[in-house]
Amino acid sequence: KIHDHHVGIISHLPHVISYSLVNSTLKEENKRNILLLAAGSFSGMARIAKSNPQMWSDIFKQNKDNLLEAITSFKNELEICENMIKNEKWDELKEWMETARALREIL
């Protein structure tokens, strides 16, 4: 149970994010121009979306509850980021980023 919770966060959620990023990019009107600009950050994140859809849809189904919790948590963080940008809270945004950057000390 704990294992399923953890892999929902560190393995399954990144796949959801990657598929979402690529799908939202492909919906852009000038997607070809955008993709020509794609560099390391996008390519690294988009690489995961090249994974086998059958396999990953089965994994998502198997770990549905934990994955939904992870998605909710991610959406909350995304809203926090969105609000800081919208309200021009640049110092708070920088602190929020620094908090995430601390991961490099763990990994």
Please provide the spans of the model-predicted regions:
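Conserved Rossmann-fold dehydrogenase catalytic segment
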Residues: K1-L13, R32-L35
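Generic alpha-helical structural context detector
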Residues: G8-S11, H15-V22, S43, R47
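N-terminal glycine-rich phosphate-binding loop for ADP-containing cofactors
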Residues: I17-R32, I59
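Interdomain hinge/lid region at the active-site interface
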Residues: K31-A100
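Amphipathic alpha-helical coiled-coil segments
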Residues: I106-L107
